[in-house]
Amino acid sequence: MYKAKDLRDQSLEELEATHDESRRKLFELNNEFRSQKKREKPHEMKHTRKDIARLLTVITEKRRENQNQTNQG
C-alpha cells in the first residue's frame, strides 16, 4: 500500500511506471476472481484500486505543478 507522502517524493516517470504496474495487478486480480469465483485475499482488490487513485492524484498534482511553473517562467 502506497502513502501519498512517499509518492510525492518520486518523479513523474516513476509514478507513471508504478501506475502501470498497479493497473496490471488489478487486471490480474479481476481475472483471478472471474476464473475462481473465490479469492484468497479479497481485500487486495480494494487496496489496489485505492493505490491507483492515490497515484493518479499525485500524478495530476505534479503535472499541474509543472504546468504552473512553465506558465509563470
Swiss-Prot record:
Keywords: Ribonucleoprotein, Ribosomal protein. It holds the Pfam family Ribosomal_L29. It comes from Protochlamydia amoebophila (strain UWE25). InterPro entries: Ribosomal_uL29, Ribosomal_uL29_CS, Ribosomal_uL29_sf. Residues 1-20 are annotated as: Disordered. It comes from the Bacteria. GO terms for biological process: translation. Belongs to the universal ribosomal protein uL29 family. One of its GO terms (molecular function) is structural constituent of ribosome. One of its GO terms (cellular component) is ribosome. This is Large ribosomal subunit protein uL29.
